[in-house]
Amino acid sequence: MVKGHVLVCVTGQRTCERLISAGAEYTGGAPGRLSVVHVARTGQRFLGSEDEAGALEYLFQVSRDYGADMTLMHSDDVCGAIVTAAKKCNCGVIVLGAPRGNTRGLQLPGLLRAQLPDVDVHEIITSGE
């Protein structure tokens, strides 16, 4: 079990269920310590397609099943939005998806670690992201 709150960052894909499940494990089953966030860039619709709409609806249900709240946000600064959400909930752990294979182009985990040095950032290998 970890100290503080656990924040899970999801995309509009059903495979993010694995991230929510992993986040729930970090809480050790403690109620009220899990939040899920999806950040869409400003100008993009949250429900950009039927697939994404269905996936986000599914992830809302999965979040509820784990006793988590789920927030949808718009921001041109995805990292900044996640940092704000993490500070707001006194986050101790952030859970992110990481694609299988080459991750050299991904900057978000490093940016989060730099801006939130006291928060553990965990990357979970997912398929389809």
Regions found by a protein language model. Name each.
Residues 1-53, 62-64:
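Small/aliphatic-rich secondary-structure junction motif
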Residues 9-13, 75, 97-100:
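Structural motif
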Residues 21-23, 82-85, 108-111:
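A short acidic, amphipathic alpha-helical/loop segment
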Residues 27, 63, 86, 114-116:
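A generic structural signal for well-ordered alpha-helical segments
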Residues 35-37, 69-74, 122-124:
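General small-molecule cofactor/ligand-binding pocket signal
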Residues 51-56, 106-109:
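Charged helix-capping and loop-helix junction motifs
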Residues 64-93:
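Structural beta-alpha unit
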Residues 93-129:
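Gly/Ser-rich helix-loop-strand patches that form or flank binding pockets
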